[in-house]
């Protein structure tokens, strides 16, 4: 009898995490498994069997509830209950979580169900949301998540600050999962998770991979095309869209500190309208 993998992510074969889930699905199918991907928002056609969680109206309701009550991951009750009934039919051997935030899923209902059914869970950590009271990325240098979130510095984004409640609830629910493997995708995330409430769980770093047939050295005239001096040391940064979360401010600081006659800083990707252009030579 085939084993079954169920992955859960905000998107299916769309965006970075959606494409990662798609590749994992292809991999397990090549080894004889059946693959399902449950998603909440955008999708592209997939080789896995797709399950849509909720409707666009559920997303809107979840967004409003989060904005007013700081309830990210605690709305979408009806949509999540319907999804759990589908899991009952699938009976997966492993549930692999990716990004379960972003207004589409109730994690309290999901984790309670997974604990009751004792289904092994793998959770790939693409950001910091699992270890905080609501942030998916620490924008302000706050380290309360290491002990307990409270009085969130970003509470101005919400009508109410329930970061302490949210942080405690995540700890309580995750502690009940009998088989949980945490997979950070970078050493930086691993370092953060190892200082959080998840530090005692099974943590295994698996770095994001790339297609080496596409991303490999090729003969090119890029230096000439973009006016880059070959004699300089090149500092390269690559992101789909550049903003503070992707480390753009670090490149600004490097441009100020490094001598322009020795270094060239090259940024690949889309810049936001607010981004500054610094000519460091």
What are these regions (language model features)?
Residues 1-50, 115-119, 253-259:
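N-terminal subdomain of nucleotide-sugar transferases
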Residues 191-194, 210-225, 275-277:
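Acidic anion/phosphate-binding donor-loop and adjacent secondary structure
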Residues 1-2, 219-234:
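Nucleotide-sugar donor-binding and catalytic loop/hinge architecture
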Residues 116, 144-182, 195-197, 201-202:
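Membrane-proximal helix-turn-helix segments that form the acceptor-binding/catalytic region
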């Amino acid at each position: 009898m085939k084993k079954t993998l169920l992955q859960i992510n905000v998107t299916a074969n769309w965006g970075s995490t959606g494409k990662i889930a798609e590749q994992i699905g292809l991999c397990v199918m090549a080894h004889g498994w059946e693959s399902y991907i449950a998603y909440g928002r955008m999708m592209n056609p997939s080789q896995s069997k797709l399950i849509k969680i909720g409707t666009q109206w559920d997303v809107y309701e979840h967004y409003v509830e989060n904005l007013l009550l700081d309830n990210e991951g605690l709305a979408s009750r009806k949509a999540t209950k319907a999804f759990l009934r589908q899991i009952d039919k699938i009976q997966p051997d492993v549930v692999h979580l990716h990004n379960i935030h972003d207004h589409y899923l109730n994690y309290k209902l999901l984790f309670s169900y997974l604990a009751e059914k004792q289904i092994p869970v793998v959770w790939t950590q693409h950001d910091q949301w699992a270890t905080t009271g609501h942030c998916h990325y620490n924008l302000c240098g706050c380290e309360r998540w290491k002990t307990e979130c409270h009085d969130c510095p970003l509470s101005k984004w919400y009508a109410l600050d329930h970061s302490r409640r949210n942080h405690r609830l995540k700890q309580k629910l995750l502690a009940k999962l009998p088989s949980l493997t945490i997979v950070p995708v970078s050493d930086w995330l691993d370092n953060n998770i190892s200082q959080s409430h998840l530090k005692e769980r099974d943590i295994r770093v698996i770095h994001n991979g790339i297609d080496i047939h596409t991303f490999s050295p090729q003969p090119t005239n890029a230096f000439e095309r973009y006016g880059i001096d070959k004699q300089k040391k090149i500092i390269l940064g690559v992101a789909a869209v550049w903003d503070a979360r992707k480390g753009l401010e670090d490149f600004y600081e490097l441009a100020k500190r490094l001598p322009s006659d020795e270094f060239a800083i090259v940024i690949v990707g889309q810049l936001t309208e607010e981004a500054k252009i610094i000519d460091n030579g």
